[in-house]
């Protein structure tokens, strides 16, 4: 009996010692609660971006977050050496991992974007019908000048005595600056939002913003009204700064006068001047570098007016997810009267998605039922494949991680598509925001324009398009070249770094983008058929070519001296028997004779055949031939006559330079 009691006591001592050592080891081991900030950040990242098949314990091979800091103890009386087994199993696991190549976690980690994780906490907006939103003004917006011209965005119509001055201002600036100068810089505007927008409540923990405005030889009042509207309608706690980038202007009112004027805001508004004309695209990248204070970059054109409560709806999605880029609904400010109206088109609520045709012309298409189903209310943000490019908001660090704009893009054109594709294909989102509205003035006919500087060379916009499709469109680029055949041999510079960016960030294919995001583009703009011939259409053995003269949507084409520069004299005839220029088709006019040019899709105006050996264009539906009058410079169809030289044509390829 004494032996049994002794045995029991010794056994209890051994077991007690073992349990004590286990408790001691546990207290010395690394625990989740004791992680360093770096380890906690890594765990947060893994929670937000879970990886599949980590194994039974949920840990990846090589993950040392729960690695013991002391070896397993050897307990007297327990014959199993736990530490040796642990070392043996670890070596076996390491051997199996290396023998089998990279673990699934290693592979998956390489597929993750290298963008910073979300560190900002923000609650979703809440819709409370009937309860005025917390960012809504409590009182009606005050007028800039009570009873003044243009208040509440009502049209200002000038009399005939101003005609000459108005025309001169339109030629110089693109707008009726005579009327603009009569309107208060602080004028009140109309509210074009859906009524529901007034009842959204936003977490006040919004990110702050730097508003970046690029200008070149802008009119004074349109530029300053842009600045005034931002200051007037943006809560001061969120407006970190307004950064003006002067892209080498030579107007006197944009020099010392501007420097003195912005002192009114005690440093809130800053101006930086480029030492040469950089163009809108690169000037915006410069603006991102000059902006130091805001967490978000908001880009506005130099002739805008932000509307009531524009800020919170625009920045809230970015505050929730830093990889979201937002775009306000863009309203139209008349360049003549300064009335503000909604854009035409879109769905029954006026909402549209950004799109393009295959020649890369900007388009707007109605919001789809698929996108509507993703929202609970019609005033929530919705996905868009592309943006127009002039007005958008993006988290500053995210924009830098994307590489800003392609540094090879020059002056203007294509940058809106480049940033849109980059965002979507590399893991971000592009949202249009119905409750954030900004008015924008569009240039009027008669503006002399701002020609690019000499160092840029010819065809900068077309070169931009080529760079974009070569980097982002993959096999779809063939459809661009079918629509813009003159660009096929256009030199577009080095894109190796851009290709490397796509590879390093594991950006998705354009096919994925077309199927998942831009799925409705081909319904509106079907993939173009191959071209049979393309180039100038020259009268055989003459110096005259068919010229659209810039006319569209029903204008008559004419004969003009051949200039070999493409543009209005560049046509293509495709396998669908369409004779086209960009998104316009040639067809017979209402009189059944003269040839006009009008917008078409791929199911319309399939009515031409080109017989190269006969130098003849035949109008299929009428059986007549393409003819011309070199005296009247008219182009028409007439009864085919093989002896008539005016019915003989040749198509000569033209390459842009």
UniProtKB/Swiss-Prot annotation:
Locations listed in the record: Golgi apparatus membrane
Region annotation Disordered: where it falls in the sequence: 30-66, 83-105
Residues in compartment: Lumenal: 30-657
Annotated Gene Ontology cellular component terms: Golgi membrane
TM region positions: 7-29
Reaction catalyzed: L-seryl-[protein] + UDP-N-acetyl-alpha-D-galactosamine = a 3-O-[N-acetyl-alpha-D-galactosaminyl]-L-seryl-[protein] + UDP + H(+); L-threonyl-[protein] + UDP-N-acetyl-alpha-D-galactosamine = a 3-O-[N-acetyl-alpha-D-galactosaminyl]-L-threonyl-[protein] + UDP + H(+)
Disulfide linkage: 197-435, 426-507, 545-562, 585-600, 625-640
Annotated tissue distribution: Highly expressed in sublingual gland. Expressed at lower level in stomach, small intestiine and colon.
PROSITE patterns per the UniProt record, alphabetical: RICIN_B_LECTIN
Domain Ricin B-type lectin: from-to ranges: 532-652
Cofactor(s) listed: Mn(2+)
EC number: 2.4.1.41
Chain positions covered by the region annotation Catalytic subdomain B: 381-443
Pfam families: Glycos_transf_2, Ricin_B_lectin
Positions annotated to bind Mn(2+): 301, 303, 440
Region (Catalytic subdomain A): 206-317
Cytoplasmic side stretches: 1-6
Free-text note regarding domains: There are two conserved domains in the glycosyltransferase region: the N-terminal domain (domain A, also called GT1 motif), which is probably involved in manganese coordination and substrate binding and the C-terminal domain (domain B, also called Gal/GalNAc-T motif), which is probably involved in catalytic reaction and UDP-Gal binding.
Family affiliation: Belongs to the glycosyltransferase 2 family. GalNAc-T subfamily.
PANTHER family: N-ACETYLGALACTOSAMINYLTRANSFERASE, N-ACETYLGALACTOSAMINYLTRANSFERASE 7
Protein name: N-acetylgalactosaminyltransferase 7
Natural source organism: Mus musculus (Mouse)
């Amino acid at each position: 009996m004494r032996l049994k009691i002794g045995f029991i006591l010794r056994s209890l001592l051994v077991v007690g010692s073992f349990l004590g050592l286990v408790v001691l080891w546990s207290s010395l081991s690394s625990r989740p609660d004791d992680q360093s900030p770096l380890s906690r950040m890594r765990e947060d990242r893994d929670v937000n971006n879970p990886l599949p098949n980590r194994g039974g314990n949920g840990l990846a091979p090589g993950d040392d977050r729960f690695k013991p800091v002391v070896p397993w103890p050897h307990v007297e009386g327990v014959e199993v050496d736990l530490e040796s087994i642990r070392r043996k199993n670890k070596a076996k696991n390491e051997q199996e991992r290396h023998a089998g190549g990279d673990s699934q976690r290693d592979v998956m980690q390489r597929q993750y974007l290298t963008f910073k994780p979300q560190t900002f906490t923000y609650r979703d907006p809440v819709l409370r019908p009937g309860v005025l939103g917390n960012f809504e003004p409590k009182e009606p917006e005050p007028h800039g000048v009570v009873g003044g011209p243009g208040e509440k965005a009502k049209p200002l119509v000038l009399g005939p005595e101003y005609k000459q001055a108005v025309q001169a201002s339109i030629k110089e600036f693109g707008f009726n600056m005579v009327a603009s100068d009569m309107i208060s810089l602080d004028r009140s505007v109309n509210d074009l939002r859906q009524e529901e927008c007034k009842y959204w409540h936003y977490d006040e923990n919004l990110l702050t913003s730097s508003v970046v405005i690029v200008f070149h030889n802008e009119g004074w009042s349109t530029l300053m009204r842009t600045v005034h509207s931002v200051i007037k309608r943006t809560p001061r706690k969120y407006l970190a700064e307004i950064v003006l980038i002067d892209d080498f202007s030579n107007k006197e009112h944009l020099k010392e006068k501007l420097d003195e004027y912005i002192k009114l805001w005690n440093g809130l508004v800053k101006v930086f001047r480029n030492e040469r004309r950089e163009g809108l695209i690169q000037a915006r990248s410069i603006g991102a570098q000059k902006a130091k204070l805001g967490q978000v970059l908001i880009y506005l054109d130099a002739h805008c007016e932000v509307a009531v409560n524009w800020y919170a709806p625009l920045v809230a999605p970015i505050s929730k997810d830093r990889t979201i880029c937002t775009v306000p609904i863009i309203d139209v400010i008349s360049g003549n009267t300064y009335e503000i109206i909604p854009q035409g088109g879109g769905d029954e609520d006026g909402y549209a998605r950004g799109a393009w045709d295959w020649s890369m012309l900007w388009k707007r298409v109605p919001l789809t039922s698929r996108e509507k189903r993703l929202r609970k209310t019609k005033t929530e943000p919705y996905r868009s494949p592309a943006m127009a490019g002039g007005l958008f908001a993006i988290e500053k660090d995210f924009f830098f991680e994307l590489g800003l704009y392609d540094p090879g893009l020059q002056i203007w054109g294509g940058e809106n598509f480049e940033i849109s594709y980059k965002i979507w294909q590399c893991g971000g989102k592009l949202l249009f925001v119905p409750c954030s509205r900004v008015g924008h003035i569009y240039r009027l006919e008669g503006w002399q324009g701002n020609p690019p500087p000499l160092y840029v060379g010819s065809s900068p916009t077309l070169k931009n398009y080529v760079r974009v499709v070569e980097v982002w469109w993959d096999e779809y680029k063939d459809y661009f070249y079918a629509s813009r055949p003159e660009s096929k041999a256009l030199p577009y510079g080095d894109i190796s770094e851009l290709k490397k960016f796509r590879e390093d960030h594991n950006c998705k294919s354009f096919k994925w983008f077309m199927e998942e995001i831009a799925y409705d583009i081909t319904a509106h703009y079907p993939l173009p058929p191959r071209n049979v011939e393309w180039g100038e259409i020259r009268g055989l053995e003459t110096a005259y070519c068919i010229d659209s003269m810039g006319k569209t949507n029903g204008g008559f084409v004419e004969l003009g001296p051949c200039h070999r520069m493409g543009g209005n004299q560049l046509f293509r005839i495709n396998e669908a028997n369409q004779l086209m220029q960009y998104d316009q088709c040639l067809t017979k006019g209402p009189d059944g004779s003269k040839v006009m040019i009008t917008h078409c899709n791929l199911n319309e105006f399939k009515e031409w055949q080109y017989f190269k050996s006969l130098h003849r264009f035949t109008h299929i539906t009428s059986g007549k031939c393409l003819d011309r009058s070199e005296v009247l410079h008219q182009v028409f169809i007439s009864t085919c006559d093989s002896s008539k030289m005016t019915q003989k044509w040749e198509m000569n390829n033209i390459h842009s330079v």
